Amino acid sequence: MIALALPAQDSGSFTPPGIDEMHLPAILPWGAHDGFSKQMLLVILSVVIIATFFILAARKQQLVPGKLQFAGEMAYGFVRNGIAKDIIGGKDFIKYVPLLFSLFFFILVNNIYGAIPVIQLPSFSHVGGAYVMAGIVYFTWIIIGIKKNGLKYFKLATVPSGVPWYILPIVVPIEIISNFLVRPVTHSLRLFATMLAGHLIVMLAGSGIEFLVMQENVLLKGASVLVLVGAVAMYMLEALIMALQAYVFTLLTAIYIEGALHADSH
């Protein structure tokens, strides 16, 4: 594909996508590379969108809910019952519903940006945002574990019960690395890598269609139709993955919180 694109690039008729495609321009006159970018604006806008929707949905509550109230209640119930209650359970789950609810819809909206024409860039396709989200979750479940079990939590989290003492020198370092070093990294990279890969595939498919359409060869022009069909299929799959990743990130957060609350039983 690159070899085919090079002659067209030299003639000035086609430019293959590069790394600049992954960086939205700054929207303020200062800080062209590290200023307030459109991506930052999209993150702020997502908060406004979520807050506005649920405020309007809960503003005039009725016994027989309207469409907006029904949608809001279904969205809340999905996180409350389908994630928090099912995973954390007991009487503890209710206090963590606001956190899980906020995480799910914040990630969902920022992911869905990638499926909206013109924008077409999920906020978490840049690793910084994914690191921040995973960092918040990381310190949250550690604090929860310490609050529930005291400093004994670190022993409970790294020394599995029922393991023979002579195996502990092998198991404990593995548990420390797995729980306190690898876990936050994989939690963030899973979100980032999925969003980045999906965005790259859609972007390359679009560039491939543009390149093929610009060719004089009829067969190449016809091939653009096949690429278009594949691009539409990938676009639909990517939209599904955007929602799925929001669910997976929130589900793992609930699992980590449950583990911190019941570390003594693991």
Curated annotation (Swiss-Prot):
Which cell locations does it reside in? Cell membrane
Q: List all membrane-crossing ranges.
A: 38-58, 99-119, 126-146, 162-182, 191-211, 224-244
- Would the keyword Ion transport turn up in this protein's UniProt record? yes
Q: Which domain of life is it from?
A: Bacteria
Q: Give the UniProt entry's GO cellular component terms.
A: plasma membrane; proton-transporting ATP synthase complex
Q: Does the keyword Acyltransferase apply?
A: no
User: Which Pfam families has this protein been placed in?
Assistant: ATP-synt_A
InterPro entries, sorted? ATP_synth_F0_asu (IPR000568), ATP_synth_F0_asu_bact/mt (IPR045083), F0_ATP_A_sf (IPR035908)
Q: What molecular function terms (GO) are annotated for this protein?
A: proton-transporting ATP synthase activity, rotational mechanism
- Look up and give the membrane topology term: Multi-pass membrane protein
Alphabetically list the UniProt keywords. ATP synthesis, Cell membrane, CF(0), Hydrogen ion transport, Ion transport, Membrane, Transmembrane, Transmembrane helix, Transport
Describe its assembly.
F-type ATPases have 2 components, CF(1) - the catalytic core - and CF(0) - the membrane proton channel. CF(1) has five subunits: alpha(3), beta(3), gamma(1), delta(1), epsilon(1). CF(0) has three main subunits: a(1), b(2) and c(9-12). The alpha and beta chains form an alternating ring which encloses part of the gamma chain. CF(1) is attached to CF(0) by a central stalk formed by the gamma and epsilon chains, while a peripheral stalk is formed by the delta and b chains.
What is the protein's known function?
Key component of the proton channel; it plays a direct role in the translocation of protons across the membrane.
Family to which the UniProt record says this protein belongs: Belongs to the ATPase A chain family.
Q: What is this protein called?
A: ATP synthase subunit a
The scientific name of the source species is: Paenarthrobacter aurescens (strain TC1)
